């Protein structure tokens, strides 16, 4: 009987799960502007004072095998200089195709050395399914 109680007490935290108060994951905004995707981030207190820096922007495309493969990346993780403004388009120099499926991941931080302010935005999209701005 005592073993059942120990098991019950141990299993409760696993069944209830963990509520993440400061979830680092967000959904990136992707719209169509001048026939090109406009990738932006918004709705986060770390962006409010205009000091958040772009650490990484990664773009992947679905290949012929149906797998996502990285096709473009801007990596400034060690020395970030680009300041992110909420709702501002982040430049991506890549020749997008209308029917291809893409996945974008944006990582920001403010200040860059503070782990608790790192945020990750992600989104899958197709150019021909985006809403024009």
Regions found by a protein language model. Give the residues of each.
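Secretory-pathway extracellular proteins and peptide precursors enriched for disulfide-bonded cysteines
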Residues: 9-10, 29-30, 79-82
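Acidic, low-complexity Ser/Thr/Gly/Pro-rich repeat segments typical of extracellular/periplasmic
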Residues: 42, 46-133
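Sec-dependent signal peptide recognition
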Residues: 3-11
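Bacterial signal peptide processing site
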Residues: 19-21
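Contiguous beta-strand segments within globular domains
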Residues: 24-51
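Hydrophobic alpha-helical segments, principally membrane-spanning helices and signal/leader peptides
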Residues: 1-2, 25
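C-terminal motif of bacterial Sec signal peptides marking the signal peptidase cleavage site
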Residues: 14-17
């Amino acid at each position: 009987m005592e073993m059942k109680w120990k098991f019950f007490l141990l299993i409760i935290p696993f069944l209830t799960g963990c509520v993440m108060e400061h979830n680092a994951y967000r959904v990136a905004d992707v719209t169509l502007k001048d026939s090109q995707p406009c990738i932006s981030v918004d709705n986060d207190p770390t962006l409010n004072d205009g000091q958040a820096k772009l650490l990484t922007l990664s773009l992947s495309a679905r290949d012929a095998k149906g797998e996502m493969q990285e096709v473009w990346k801007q990596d400034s993780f060690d020395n970030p200089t680009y300041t992110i403004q909420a709702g501002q388009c982040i430049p991506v120099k890549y020749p997008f195709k209308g029917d291809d499926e893409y996945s974008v991941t944006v990582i920001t931080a403010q200040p860059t050395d503070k782990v608790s302010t790192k945020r990750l935005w992600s989104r899958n999209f197709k150019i021909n399914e985006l809403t024009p701005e």
